Amino acid sequence: MSRVGAIATIIISLISACASAQNSVGIFENHSDVGAVLHPGSTTFDSAKNTYTVRGNGENLWASADAFQFAWKKMSGDVEITADVQFANLTGNEHKKAVLMFRQSLDADSVYADVALHASGLTSLQYRDQKGATTSEVESRVNNHGQLEFVSGPNKYPVDYTGARLKLTRRGAYVSLSIGAMGLNATYDGESIPIALTGDFYVGIGVCSHDKDVVEEANFSNVEIKNLSASAAEPVLYSTLETVAIDTTIRRVIYSDRSHFEAPNWARDGSYFLFNRNGHIEKLAVKGGTPEVLDTGTADRVNNDHGISPDASMLAISDNSQPTKSESGEETHDSLVYVLPITGGTPRRLTKKAPSYWHGWSPDGKTLAFVGQRNGDFDIYTIPVAGGEETRLTTAKGLDDGPEYSPDGRYIYFNSERTGHMQIWRMKADGSGQEQVFSDDYNNWFPHISPDGNFMVFLTYERDVTGHPGNKDVMLRLMSLGGDKMTDKKITVLAKLFGGQGTINVPSWAPDSKSLAFVSYALIPPEDAGAPAH
């Protein structure tokens, strides 16, 4: 290289370094516009107020490409970013966003996860899990202009919809959202998703105007970014009741709690959910709130196999409270199937033998389908609701589970490991014509047919997982059936989550077949969680 060329290279490097230094602001290494914007954005820092002001343009931060102003620093590993976030005003598009973000690259279609505060009051965990994929989100309960109250110790405080204390946390493969009132503690609210961020990634704050012709402004105060060391404390289990829309895959948190609950049923009129916790059935309004315990009489060890009759007058439960005898004569408390009024009351026992686990009502409400272990094998049985003897429908070696009637009553769908790993099957209601619905490299459990008969949702584990344990990386997948002949069979992913046992053991479709309910789980270090969710 000539002397002149070497000098030119040095000058260019110095200019680039100076430009980068000029773009550093506060704790952030740089700021820039991401994606296509018509009007340049900006980020400034007021050290006296410890506040960043971000002004951003951009048509959207959504779909398969983003456009926004972003202030960032590169980090790796487990990371947490926290800030008080508030819009300068609530004029303009109600979908304008102020975000805390983890982003793989500065490409417009990059993998990312963020907590997004919207001018409408919506707060959500947004994510794009593959480069160029469509963004989805988990909507927080904190919306509708801060109607939800958070609990911090003995004090309750409402969340101001114009701003909030937000925290985005990455632990291993999962990113979670915490939220609280400005200036106070942010608490885990139930939003958690797996996202693959590799090596160095970008951590920062941003604003999107959601209107390509204007620039919008938000303030980020008391911003803290830190790497997280491995927690020495025992993680806390959180259970979260969510819904997911099958057309958009948008998830919404309904209820989250620092306890273990399972298996939601969606009421036939769409107004409430039922789920089990601590041996009881609890009822929760579809809008959330505080659950109420349903009276189930002497059945006080109800497990996660329960469901509402087609006419909404009765509830079938599986319960372990009564003494039973095993086939070898040992005293046990194995599961039995009962029915009781939907409003609560004394349960009436149906199955004579144990263990028995309810899974389906016939459309006419006259027959129950259940799983029973007899002579060492788990098979599918039916029994009249009025009482009578059980009828065995399957005889194949290996576990058969999860029987559920199709809405027209012609078929019973179930899962079976008769081929070597768990797959979805169906048979005619009398047990004849058993056929495998599809086969793939996963283990698939608990088929649930939509009320309109057009779709089937099911729980998917990785191939190497045995049984249906809890606390695993799982998927909810959706198959389009295309009628009784199953001419479509297109499968899509509705949600990726931490769960398994308890997530979707029983029917949980909304009456309109547009969404369904499920339970996700999270193991959160106490120092990440803040105060308990309620």
Features from the language model and the residues they span:
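Positively charged n-region of N-terminal signal peptides that target proteins for export
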Residues: 1-4
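N-terminal compositionally biased, intrinsically disordered segments and leader/signal-like regions
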Residues: 10, 135, 188, 249-250
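Acidic/proline-rich low-complexity IDRs
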Residues: 13, 147, 183, 194-196, ...
